[in-house]
Each structure stands twice: as C-alpha cells, then as structure tokens.
C-alpha cells in the first residue's frame, strides 16, 4: 500500500458490542484520500453517554484512544438510545465528527441534541 501525503495513515475504529461481544468496528480505513472521507454510522448506546474511538496507525506504533462525551444526552433505559455519527476530514490530520441523538422510535423521540468535535490525528 502506497501512502502519499493525501492518504490517511490510520484506521479509525469504534469500540462497540457486536452480538453481545466487545468488538472494534472499522469506520474509516487507512489508505483512502483524506479529502474523500465522508461516512456515517448508527450506534445503539448501552446506558452510556460516551463513544470510544481508536486511531490505529497502519505503519505500526501505538494506538490512540479518543473518548467523546455526549453531554446532556437524556438518560434512557439500557439500549434505548440511538445516535448517528458522521465523519469527514477537514485536512490530512483533522477529523470532524458530528453526532446526533436519534431517540428510539416512538418510545423515546429524539432530543434534537447534536455534538460536533474536531480531532487532530497524530501520525495520521
């Protein structure tokens, strides 16, 4: 894999449960042009107001964790909070994350809350 200055040098993963087991799910793969990174994912949160991401360098080195707090997220029963995460790159080393509370169907309507955060990806 050839990594020129336009290529993302790290995978961006989210820590989640997959069929009840802890898993590291890839959201953005290394090797793509940074300016082409635009993706989204929906997560069901399990009684938490935090999303845990991992920056996994393709060239080796230490993984870097990122914790995103969702301040003011309404407290709901376990697994009754759905959020949409959208990712885009603002530069070769700056990731923009937008998160939106989707609620949980008719049971728990969306709060309308949104969070945005920019992360600088060291070694990206």
What are these regions, as identified by a protein language model?
Residues 1-124:
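Acidic low-complexity intrinsically disordered segments
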């Amino acid at each position: 894999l050839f990594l020129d200055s336009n290529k993302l040098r790290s995978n961006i993963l989210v820590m989640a449960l997959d069929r009840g087991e802890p898993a590291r799910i890839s959201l953005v793969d290394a090797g793509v042009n940074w300016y082409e990174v635009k993706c989204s994912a929906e997560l069901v949160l399990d009684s938490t107001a935090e999303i845990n991401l991992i920056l996994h360098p393709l060239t080796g080195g230490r993984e870097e964790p990122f914790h995103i707090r969702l301040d003011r997220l309404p407290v709901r029963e376990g697994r009754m909070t759905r959020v949409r995460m959208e990712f885009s790159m603002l530069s070769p080393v700056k990731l923009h994350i937008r998160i939106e509370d989707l609620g949980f169907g008719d049971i728990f309507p969306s709060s309308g809350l949104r969070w945005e955060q920019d992360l600088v990806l060291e070694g990206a």
